[in-house]
Structures are given as C-alpha cells and as structure tokens.
Amino acid sequence: MKMKVCTFAVSGLMLTLTVCAAPFETKVVGTCAGDVRVACKDTRDWVFDVQRVDADGVDEIAVRLSAAKDAPPPRFEVLFEFPQIRMNHVWTDGSTDGNRLGPDWRSWQWSDIAHGQPLACLHDGDNRNRLTMACSEALRKVEWRIALREENCMVVGGFRFFCAPEAPVREYEVRIRLDGRDMFWSDAVQEAAAWIARAAKLMSCRVPEAAYNPLYSTWYQFHQNVSANEIEAECAIAAKMGMKTVILDDGWQTDNNNRGYAFCGDWNVSPRRFPDMAAHVRRVHELGMKYMVWYSVPFVGRNSKNRERFKGKYLFEYKQHGAWVLDPRFPEVRKFLVDTYVAAMKEWGLDGFKLDFIDSFRFNGKDPAVAEDYAGRDIRSLPDAVNRLMMDVYAALSAENPDVLIEFRQKYIGPAIRQFGNMMRATDCPGDMQLNRQRIANLRLTSGGAAVHADMLEWHPTDTPEGAALPILSSMFGVIQYSMMLRDLPESHREVIRHWLAFSQAHRDTLLKGHFRAYHPESQYPLLEAESEAERIIGVYAAGQVVPCGAFDRTVYVLNGVSGDSAVLDFADGTATAEVFDAAGKAAGTVKLCRGVQRVAVPRSGYLRIVPPADYCLCKRFGDGEVQP
C-alpha cells in the first residue's frame, strides 16, 4: 500500500506522521473489451461509484466521484485488455499514417475541448469494427489509447483522467462506451461521435446553408500581404466561378509581413491596406459574396498596445509566436474578446469569423492561478472558461445575425466546438491532396451536422487541366475552399473549377449532407462514398481499386480521382449504359456495363453517371430470402 508522509506543527513542535494513501480498484466483468478495471492510487477524500449501463448491444460504464467539499479531483484510470484477434489497425480523428496499432510503451494520446476527441476505433482490414471506444469527457484533458502489448499480443486500452491541473470541484461523472459490434467501421465511429455529444449534453449550434457554400481564402497566396484592391479583384473572378464567400486571413491588422503574431491583440485594421474596411466589405457583398475575417483568439502580441492592459491576465508567454496567451478565466478578458468581434461585425458588416488558435488556451507547466488562489477569476477551470468564452462569443454574434458563419480547424473539432462553430476545416496541408482527403474524411465521421471544409486548394498554373482537377476531386466530400491567384490561371483551369463547383453545389445534399462511408482508412481512404435517397456518389483514389456500385436503385456517380484513365467497377445488377464525362464535365461518350467486375474507360479526372432505366424494377424479397426481379 502506498504511504504518504505528512509534516505539521503542534504547539511549536514539528511532527511527522506517516499515513496510508487510500487506493480504489474495481472491475466490470465481461464487456466486449474483456474485464474493465477502474483504479485510483490515492482517492484522498473522494468516493467512487462505478456502474455498468448497457444499451443496444453496447457496453457503457458510468464512473462517479464525490467529495464532502471542493477539492482537486484525483487521477484515475479505466483500463482493459483482450487478445488481438482480427484487430489490425487503429483509427483516431487524427489518423493519417496508415492507422498503425502501436506498442503500449508509446501510444497514449490525449484530447480536450480544443484538441480532438476521446474516440478510437480498432478495425480489421475488411472495413469491420472490432472495438470502438469513446468517453463522455469533451472539455477536460483525457489521455487514452488502444495499443499492443508485445509480450503476449494482448490489446491494451483505456482512459486516464485528471492528468493535467484541474480546479477544485465537489463531484464528477464520466461515461465510457465500448462497442464491439460487427458492423462497418465508419458507421461505428459516427455513432460513437454522436454519443459523445449526447452523453456530454452538448447541443450543436445552427448550421446555415451558407456554411456549405464554396469559398475563396486569402491565406496561401497572399499570406499577410493583403489589401482591399487585391482582394476585390480576386473576388470578382471568384464570384463568376461560383464561389460564394471570402475569408480574409492574417495581415489585415498589421503592415508587417514577417509572419508571427507579434502585432495581434489590438485588432485595428491597417489603414494602408484597408482605408475603408466597411466600404470594402460592401463592394465584396455587391459581387454576391459573404465576408469572413480571421482572428487569433488568445494572442496578444509583444508589439500590441493591449499587452500592458492585460498584464497579469495571461496563461503564459508563447515566445515562438511572439505573443502572450490570454487567460479566459478573467471576466474582463472574455468581455474584451466578445466585444471585439461584435464591434467588427457591426462596423464592417461581416458575415462570419475564422477563429484560430483556441488550442493555445492551455497551461505551459503549472496553473498560474493556484499560487494566486484564483484571484480575479470568476471561473476556476480553464476548459470551462474556454467553453464559456466561446459560448458567449457565439451568443453575441448570433444575436446580431442568426446565420453567422464561424470556422474552426482541426484539431479543435470535437462536440464542444460544435456548440459555437458551424464550419470545420481540415488543418493546413498545402498542395497535399491525399492528406486533405484523409482529414476531410476524418472530419466527416465526427462532425455531426456541421459543414466540413477542405483545406484550401492550390496548384501550379502550368499543370494540365486534368492535373488541376485531381486535388478538387480529392476534396469533393467537403466544402471546397480555394486559395490561389485566380487571375494567373489559364482558361482551361478556370473551366475545370467552374464545372466542379457547379457539380459540388448541384449534388451538395448528397456529397456534404448524405450518409457518408469511408473505406480502408489503413490505406488512406482509396474509396469514399456518400448517399442520399436520390443518388450515390463514389470517389475512387487508388489505381485498380474495385468500386462496389451497390444496388441499382438510384443514380450512381463514379469520380475518377486517380491519374489513370480507367476504373474497375463491381456492378451488381444486370446491364446498364453509363455516360462518360471528362475533367471539365464535357460528354465523352458512353460505356456498356454488365453484371460483375469489369474495367471501363474513364477519362483522367473525369466521371461516370449510371442512371437506372425507366422500366427498372426494384427487387422484392420473399419468404426465405429468394430474390425475384
């Protein structure tokens, strides 16, 4: 038993007393992940209550802690292990490296309000779920893993709680969900992500239709060197192509082009770059585009006039970025940020905001508030304060405009973020269409009804039209953002952009809102599929990948996202004629399809449209499962 040594004074004498730390351990027997152990090495004055709450074939475990008075909660863990049988890969919302099942000595990951979510799926190589685990803690830091113990080929997994500084509380509850059902792996992940939001009692904010509109971003091509005239010129071209929104990124608040965030925090527009910001926004509105502006939420730069104003109200100095990180537990900090965004919306006529770097609201070592007994802070818990800040921001902005657009990027994309964000963007991967596709797919599985956006697309203007179309096709299951000098593109590239923008919007209910399935994450998603009542759209991204076209009960589109000029189809129903289109959407003939697996010609970056004939009759099943046409 662990011993604690306590030293205290009595009548001027120093006494030392050795006492026993109070451990806690219990087991929940017979779950789909084997026996689950709940353990705490030192409960101090906390009481644990562990209950099994099974529902719909899924194991749920509720862990409740209570104390007689407010106190920092104790560190505890929920662990399990079972044999590795048909368990080859692990998916997480940040997986991009082949979903490796790592060794137990280096496989702990973590999540909190602004970093991922506590969710992982152990799957085989045939798209089947073996175990999906999740927990209901969406705000505080949680450590978690699924890994392999090399000594005996046992899969070990679980969660660790309160590994980071946490403010005193009197009670705490968390639920663990373990799903071992044999089902398509991405369906299991989507169910678990929805469960986290329900279990944590988090309500997603409104997602206006404009959140699904394609847009133009200034970041990759302009970086900080932005100006009203340049943006208006690009927006004039973008609007004619079909883009509906522009995001003005970093640089509008400073004349400095040296990157970094030393000039953030005052949030006054540069008069040299934008002499009349409100008039500039109006001119873009007249083009038919909405206007969003970037802010780095927590940063007050070393060159900011507000740096002294908030002295003593920072979490730490972020030297790498040349800025200080505000502490949102101070009410005046939250008010300053809310007022800043509301004033910008009112004065400039903004439609939305790109709110960046909220993952920097963290401790860089110890919590500075503890030594000050939380003086001046009306919220003790940092995750709770971040949540309160962003909820206040959304409430204030949506009061001005119920259809306000708010974008966040990976990794701040969990269910708590969806309370105040309606656009979730793949994190930066300039020029990397494969990584963009992976990140879009990961977001589609975990973002509920929020609009999932691609990272901004760019390519070299001397590429072929078919080459220009490839990154677009890799991003078709997210809202497409462009960030390139449109004025420098040849007409053949503009034609490709116009076609695929029109295609993505004509099919947005399927591509962006339909039931989404992602195949073979261990192979970087060679096949993605979205389905609505009217149609099924399949993107193929690996040469030779067999494309299951599914039942011939609706129109099927097959998008050729590889560099070759053919596709391998598995056609289940009879015969059909497929229409063929090239990268710019121009008709390129027809091809006959028959039952079974076949290779058909499809232009590079083109697609097929397979429409059921008018006299097609859906199959009906009788009695013992016999199928009749």
Language model regions located:
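Active-site-proximal substrate-binding groove within the catalytic cores of carbohydrate-active enzymes
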Residues: 166-173, 389-615
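An acidic-aromatic substrate-binding cleft motif
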Residues: 196-237, 241-245, 253-254
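Positively charged n-region of N-terminal signal peptides that target proteins for export
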Residues: 1-6
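Short, acidic/polar
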Residues: 225-240, 333-346, 468
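Aromatic- and carboxylate-enriched substrate-binding clefts and catalytic-loop regions
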Residues: 249-454
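N-terminal accessory beta-strand-rich subdomains and adjacent acidic, glycine-rich linkers
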Residues: 22-196, 202, 565-571, 578-585, ...
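Bacterial N-terminal signal peptides
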Residues: 8-18
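Active-site mouth loops of central-metabolism enzymes
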Residues: 218-229, 322-336, 458-464
